[in-house]
Amino acid sequence: YDNFDDGKIDKKYEFKNHPGKWVEKGGVISQTEPKPGDHTYLVMAGDFDEPHTSIVQIRVDEWGDGDLARCGLGFRLDPADASGYAFLIHHFLTNMEFLNDHLAWKQNDTKPPFGVIKTGEWYWMKAEISDKKFTGKIWPDGEKEPKKWLLESKLDFGGLRPASGQVGLNGGSSAALPAKTVVSFDNWAICEKASECDPDVILAVEATSKLSTTWGKIKTSY
């Protein structure tokens, strides 16, 4: 778990395949280069057993429509170049989709249930991976988490990637305008079960700066 409150990027994080320009300031971490290159991940190389779930608060700060405009969560990231499965805001701020990096899109373009992702506003993104399927959802900060996953799929697009235990924050892929992505993240956690990745629990942890046994295990497992 990381609430990014100390203003220092954890030395355990890795930046692949392109480094981007990550800045931790004001209690958030941001990828501030609008054209960081395809692809740009902050990676937590944690050897997390599957299934596992990742949750994060996300805020799109700048956006230009285009195929390489994207941001979100990555799983089974390759230790060499961080290619993996991703749950992304993609192309437009009205579209969510699954990607197998550089191999194939799932082609499951889906509009968020609330319509459009607005720049400058916070949302929660949550996704889970197992050997059977990949799932993801997004909802506005301050609203109740939807019970159902927005996207669900078998790992059947672009060829099967091996489990790596590595997860990451996708900070964009654009190499040229008009596509661009500047994005911020906060309150990032990886959990053994989807039910443990609960915003109320995470925000309570942030408020008290005290980790329960479960969170302590997560914190020390990478």
Task: Label each region the model flagged.
Residues Y1-N17, P199-L203, A207-G216:
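Extracellular carbohydrate-recognition regions
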Residues F4, D186-I190:
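Extracellular beta-strand elements of beta-rich domains used
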Residues F4, S54-V56, K118-S130, F134-I138:
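Short tryptophan-centered beta-strand motifs in secreted/extracellular beta-sheet-rich domains
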Residues G20-D38:
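Short carbohydrate-recognition loop motifs
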Residues T32-N100:
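Secretory/extracellular carbohydrate-interaction modules
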Residues T40-D47, T110-I117, F157:
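Beta-strand-rich interaction surfaces with strong enrichment in secreted/lumenal proteins
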Residues D101-W124:
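Short, aromatic/His-centered strand-loop micro-motif at the edge of beta-sheets
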Residues K147-V183:
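Flexible glycan-contacting loops in extracellular carbohydrate-active proteins
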